[in-house]
From Swiss-Prot:
Residues 1-77, 108-194 are annotated as: Disordered. Keywords: DNA-binding, Metal-binding, Repeat, Zinc, Zinc-finger. The lineage of its organism: Eukaryota, Viridiplantae, Streptophyta, Embryophyta, Tracheophyta. This is Putative zinc finger CCCH domain-containing protein 48. InterPro entries: ZFP36-like (IPR045877), Znf_CCCH (IPR000571), Znf_CCCH_sf (IPR036855). It holds the Pfam family zf-CCCH. Residues 143-156 have a biased composition (Acidic residues). A zinc finger (C3H1-type) spans 377-406, 439-467, 469-496. One of its GO terms (molecular function) is mRNA binding.
Length: 496
């Protein structure tokens, strides 16, 4: 029926409403308003928002692009109902109640400010008692499957709901629908990263896995707390848990030994260091042959813990063990410090003195007498090889024969002087008796002063420079067969 009035007259057009066999309203042409049985004007396909004139509240409604449904609508067996988009919205007592519409990234309840994906059994259901009785028998499974296929992307925070987008604007869902989210924020979803790996300490120590920043460490044993018998208890625990050498602390690493920022690199801070006088033996501190850490971020190793106290204790025990293996037990004690047991009759002799040689002078005179008789023929004859080889002797300075007339010496047997009872209280008299001492180092060496290399070196009887002039006193180190620590700078004579 249609009433029209020109000017002051209002034209009212009433169209015929058509219902199907189940009592559902059949939509008319796209874009026009249809009056439902509840007295509400609802935008049918081609429209966007259904307004409730009584409450004045706009209800957000899902909308297919272009206003067309991808499949024939499947009726929900409730009478009456209104087809909105592709959802059948039942009407009770003249009002549209509790609709939930399927949208691109989930489902949205009417009047809410966030969307959440609903389980399949509750999709499109109405939170009313009358609807609950029929929802189990009249669920639209085909429609649910089609809606889920259209969903291509879902953004959730850690507990599932979609993060709202920018306030008041329309966001395009993956299912081809525009979603109006009141009070949301723009665009990017928050993804708090609480899904971090659980790290096992044994795997980290063995290098099987690498440390993950922020990872949760699975420590399957309590931290070690020093007690009165803590050292013995820890020693027993390690001995029973580690069958071979190279022990590793797998269950006695405290959380304080882990580095910051999630980089797990357990260094051994020994908790018992302050409770005892000395730590355990070094072989229990760490693997003796373990390689050094490759990288603090790639592999975590146990490292050797060393301190002055532990080093000294370990050294003391090592020396005691080695000494006990090679020395009688009476000479090594283990009372916490070393005790050096004096050996009876230890050889100790003072440097020999150049005392006068006399008959029956005793043991002190014998070395000097033997030295004097050994030097009886030293440098008293010319070296034949020295002249035959063109002034070159293979023995060099060690040759007992004189290499030239300047090298000749006059040696007088000491025994004859001793038998005669001659001598003086000074050491000069005994060596002066060897002959030629009045000329020793009193003149400069011609070879040395000419810039040549003297083959006699320190044994040359002539002075090599002004410093050696007047060196008449014999060097004790040289004549006793030892090396003089002063070398050529010695103020005493290094020559026979």
């Amino acid at each position: 029926m249609a009433d029209s009035e020109d000017g002051d007259h209002v034209a009212t057009t009433t169209t015929e409403q058509r219902y199907d066999d189940d009592g559902h309203l059949v939509p008319s042409s796209g874009g026009q308003e249809e009056e439902g049985s509840g007295g509400r004007d609802v935008v049918v396909p081609g429209g966007h928002v259904a307004e409730d004139y009584r409450s004045g509240v706009g209800v957000p409604v899902g909308r297919d692009a272009g206003g067309a449904t991808s499949s024939p609508p499947q009726p929900v067996h409730v009478t009456p109902s209104i087809l909105v988009g592709s959802i059948h919205a039942p009407v009770f007592q003249g009002e549209l109640v509790g609709m939930k519409f399927g949208v691109g990234s989930g489902s949205m309840g009417a009047g809410t400010s966030a969307t959440r994906r609903l389980p399949a059994t509750g999709f499109g259901a109405l939170p009313t008692s009358s609807m609950a009785e029929d929802s189990a028998d009249h669920a639209d499974d085909d429609h649910l499957a089609e809606e889920e296929e259209e969903e291509e992307e879902e953004h959730y925070i850690d507990d599932g709901p979609l993060v709202p987008s920018s306030g008041g604007q329309e966001e395009e869902g993956s299912g081809g629908r525009h979603v109006f989210v009141p009070g949301g924020h723009d665009g990017e979803e928050d993804h708090p990263d609480d899904l971090v790996a659980d790290l096992d300490l044994d795997l980290l120590v063995d290098g099987v896995v690498g440390p993950v920043p922020g990872g949760h460490l699975n420590a399957d044993a309590p931290a070690f707390v020093p007690t009165t018998r803590g050292r013995q208890d820890l020693y027993s625990a390690l001995s029973s848990s580690a069958p071979a050498a190279g022990y590793r602390y797998r269950h006695y690493i405290t959380s304080s030994a882990l580095a910051e920022a999630g980089h797990v690199s357990p260094f051994l801070g020994l908790p018992y260091a302050t409770a005892f006088d000395s730590p355990l033996d070094r072989e229990l501190v760490g693997p003796s042959s373990a390689p050094p850490p490759c990288s603090a971020a790639s592999r975590a190793w146990l490292v050797r813990c060393s301190s002055p106290l532990s080093d000294s204790e370990w050294t003391r025990r090592s020396i005691l063990a080695r000494e006990a293996a090679h020395t009688p037990a009476s000479t090594v004690t283990g009372r916490g410090r070393f005790e050096f047991v004096p050996i009876p009759g230890a050889p100790y002799a003072p440097p020999p003195s150049f005392a006068p040689i006399a008959a029956g002078a005793g043991p002190a005179a014998r070395p000097l007498q033997q030295l004097a008789f050994g030097l009886e023929e030293h440098k008293t004859k010319l070296c034949a090889e020295y002249y035959s080889r063109g002034l070159g002797c293979p023995r060099g300075n060690t040759c007992k024969y004189a290499h030239g007339e300047d090298d000749l010496r006059l040696v007088v047997a000491v025994s004859s002087l001793a038998d005669a009872g001659e001598g003086s209280s000074s050491s000069d008299s005994s060596f002066a008796a060897l002959g030629g001492e009045d000329k020793y180092k009193t003149k400069l060496c011609k070879t040395f002063t000419s810039g040549g290399l003297c083959l006699f070196a320190a044994n040359c009887r002539f002075a090599h420079g002004e410093v050696e002039l007047g060196k008449k006193e014999p060097c004790w180190y040289f004549f006793s067969g030892q090396t003089c620590p002063r070398g050529d700078t010695c103020g005493f004579r290094h020559s026979y």
